[in-house]
Amino acid sequence: MNKAVFLDRDGTINVEKNYLYKIEDFEFTEGAVEAIKLLNQNEYKVIVISNQAGVARGYYTEEAVDKLHEYIQKQLKKYDAHIDAFYYCPHHPIHGVGKYKLQCKCRKPEDGLYKRAIKDFNIDVEKSYAVGDKLSDLIPAVDNNIKSFLVMTGYGKEEVKNIKTDMRITKNLYSFVTEII
């Protein structure tokens, strides 16, 4: 079985910018590249799980999300780092348009994408972690017995007042990695 770190994307890996999809707007959070590289070097599967409601709302396409993920991989490759997989939910139950307006099991805080990734990568949840800047990023991890960390980047400073007792707080993705390695 494999150990993994499940990462939220916006506000955790990259600077939070509402409905980010343009490559020119992408910016890693401080220490994120180094953190991902350390996770790779320590044999953690690095798996991104992200809600992409901008697709549901019609702001951008799934192809735009995929292009941004390809760009992220190219940037990480320059530093001998990589993300093992990107999973994202393009749905929204209220604000979705057309086929994207639905109540699904993949939109966090539901755990459908976590369950899929756990199965796809044969993940040992007891040796794994989740990191995000919103409680909704971490609830599905906690529901699957994955140790969870709320970062103070993105929305983390606003979310911390509602933190659950089974979640830890850390400054950013890099500080999380230094705590577990």
Swiss-Prot record:
For activity, the cofactor(s) needed are:
Mg(2+); Zn(2+)
- Give its localization: Cytoplasm
UniProt keyword annotations, A-Z:
Capsule biogenesis/degradation, Carbohydrate metabolism, Cytoplasm, Hydrolase, Magnesium, Metal-binding, Zinc
Query: Which is one Pfam family of this protein?
Result: PNK3P
Could you say which residues are annotated as the site Contributes to substrate recognition?
A: 107
Q: Which reaction does it catalyse?
A: D-glycero-alpha-D-manno-heptose 1,7-bisphosphate + H2O = D-glycero-alpha-D-manno-heptose 1-phosphate + phosphate
Q: Which GO terms describe its molecular function?
A: D-glycero-beta-D-manno-heptose 1,7-bisphosphate 7-phosphatase activity; magnesium ion binding; zinc ion binding
The pathway noted for it is: Nucleotide-sugar biosynthesis; GDP-D-glycero-alpha-D-manno-heptose biosynthesis; GDP-D-glycero-alpha-D-manno-heptose from D-glycero-alpha-D-manno-heptose 7-phosphate: step 2/3
Q: Looking at the keywords, is Metal-binding present?
A: yes
The UniProt entry's GO biological process terms, in alphabetical order, are:
carbohydrate metabolic process
Q: Which residues form the signal peptide?
A: none
Which leading EC class covers this enzyme?
A: hydrolase
Q: What are the positions of the active site? A: 8 (nucleophile), 10 (proton donor)
Assembly, in brief, is: Monomer.
Q: Which NCBIfam families match?
A: GmhB_yaeD (TIGR00213), HAD-SF-IIIA (TIGR01662), Histidinol-ppas (TIGR01656), PRK08942.1 (NF006506)
As a miscellaneous remark, the entry gives: Is probably involved in the capsular polysaccharide (CPS) biosynthesis.
- Record-given protein name: D-glycero-alpha-D-manno-heptose-1,7-bisphosphate 7-phosphatase
Question: Which gene is this protein's source?
Answer: gmhB
